[in-house]
A protein has these predicted regions:
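Acidic/polar low-complexity segments with low predicted structural confidence
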Residues: 1-138, 195, 289
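Von Willebrand factor
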Residues: 112, 137-193, 196-238, 243, ...
Length: 289
């Protein structure tokens, strides 16, 4: 169902003439069917926001060959952008070792000497002398909600892709990514550990659609995060915070442990009000990078 929705969303395309508004476009794609990766890398270094915005348009190019080249590049580029300033990884349970009588799976390598000694004596090893291993509880779970209602241009797509890659870098296993309007597309479900590049590529296929039902989005996030055993569960809302359909979002938000609204810096008033009303935080976003 999600794949079908993404396929339908991705049918809209961007012409070369539309992309010519970007100064670097002619150098990156000097002719039909060409994508110069070296020129792209230079442009990305000089102006990350502008170049990521262009990348979001390239993956939806009318030029089929250019589109395929951009799609082969997109996921890797966005993930690399995130990794260059990557925070300490969290959210993956840490492998820990303990006495086997405290539970867990037997660690044969660490217990081998004890087992051999017991066999030599002709008796069974005691659990307290054996070593087991298990995973400690992850301390962070994230759910990223991407508002895809209305217009979904290059800059919004690029910002959403970077936000998703950053979330998956922070909590690689325990992150869900959902695109919503008056319905929802679950791009990555909680605990799926879906590859970040795959998620980014799916996000780049999104196009604007429908009205903005924040309450529905919050309920969807709560259902995803309920699957997690993490000690801290954060919902990230990438939106201007302006609900145009559905129930009162402030009521639905009470089911969320923690809410952070990622709002466009030039249109954050509603997002700030929403965050304030539910005890959340609002962070201004001025560009993809």
């Amino acid at each position: 169902e999600a794949e079908q929705a993404l396929a339908e969303a991705g049918r809209q395309s961007t012409s070369r003439r539309q992309m010519e508004q970007h100064e670097s476009f002619q150098e990156i794609s000097p002719e039909v069917g060409i994508l110069d990766e070296e020129a792209f890398a230079d442009a990305l270094r000089d102006d990350p926001d502008e170049t990521l915005t262009l990348l979001a348009e390239l993956v939806g190019a009318t030029d089929e060959k250019l589109r395929e080249l951009a799609r082969s590049l997109a996921g890797r580029v966005v993930v690399d952008v995130v990794r260059t300033g990557a925070p300490r990884r969290r959210g993956i349970g840490r492998l820990r070792h303990r006495r086997a009588d405290h539970g867990g799976e037997l660690d044969v390598d660490r217990s081998l000497e004890t087992i051999a000694a017991s066999r030599a004596r002709g008796d069974a090893p005691s659990l307290e002398d054996l070593t087991a291993r298990d995973w400690s509880k992850p301390n962070l779970a994230l759910c990223l909600l991407i508002d895809r209602s209305g217009s979904m241009g290059g800059e919004r797509l690029a910002t959403a892709a970077v936000a998703a890659a950053a979330s998956l870098w922070r909590a690689p296993i325990d992150t869900s990514v959902i695109a919503f309007s008056d319905d929802a597309i679950v791009i990555a479900s909680q605990g799926s550990g879906r590859d970040a590049e795959d998620v980014v590529n799916q996000i780049f296929r999104l196009r604007g659609h429908g009205t903005t039902d924040l309450a529905f989005a919050f309920r969807t996030a709560a259902a995803q995060l309920a699957r997690s055993s993490a000690t801290r569960k954060i919902t990230l809302l990438l939106s201007d915070g302006r609900a145009t359909a559905g129930d009162d979002p402030t009521i639905a938000a009470t089911d969320l442990d923690e809410l952070i609204v990622l709002a466009p810096a030039d249109d954050a008033e509603n997002a700030q009000s929403l965050a304030d009303s539910v005890g959340g935080r609002c962070v201004m976003v001025s560009g993809p990078a």
